[in-house]
A protein has these predicted regions:
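Intrinsic disorder/low-complexity detector
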Residues: 1-10, 22-23, 45-77, 117-122
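A structural feature that tracks compact, well-ordered secondary-structure segments
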Residues: 3-7, 14-31, 40-43, 68-72, ...
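Short amphipathic alpha-helical linker/capping segments at the junctions of internal repeats
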Residues: 32-38, 56-60, 99-104
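Short, surface-exposed linear patches
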Residues: 38-39, 47-54, 92, 103-106, ...
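Long terminal segments
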Residues: 76, 99-104, 111-122
Length: 122
């Protein structure tokens, strides 16, 4: 199992979902409070394992309801996704990958590790 790691900076909070192998699966947006950050983690735990995939790199792609993984392509041909929830919208972003297949494997990894626990903080 992976871990959610909360980071605090100046009274604002974000989190990383780290896979069991230590790789960061996604980085969250910045939240104004720890409670909102924790709510986002709870929603991700509840929905990320069954969320659909919307591939905006395809011509005339079909829009699907949230929660979902929306795939994007950068100007230099790399791929990343954003995780979009039905309650809070766009809450997390993946790293960029040179191949879409690598990105799809990362989505599957996130689906299997989204119910991870919160890292212990001292």
């Amino acid at each position: 199992m992976g871990q959610y790691v909360i980071i605090e900076n100046g009274g604002r909070y974000c989190y990383n979902l780290c896979a069991s192998n230590g790789h960061v699966l996604v980085n969250s947006i910045v939240f104004p409070s720890r409670d909102e950050c924790l709510k986002s983690i709870d929603e991700m735990r509840d929905t990320a394992s069954t969320a659909g995939i919307e591939d905006s790199t395809e011509d005339a792609f079909d829009r699907i309801p949230s929660p979902k993984y929306r795939i994007y392509e950068t100007m230099d041909g790399k791929y990343f996704f954003r995780f979009i929830t039905s309650m809070a919208g766009d809450v997390a972003r993946s790293h960029e990958y040179p191949k879409k297949e690598s990105l799809l494997r990362r989505i599957e990894r996130m689906r299997s590790e989204c119910d991870s626990s919160l890292a212990r903080q001292d």
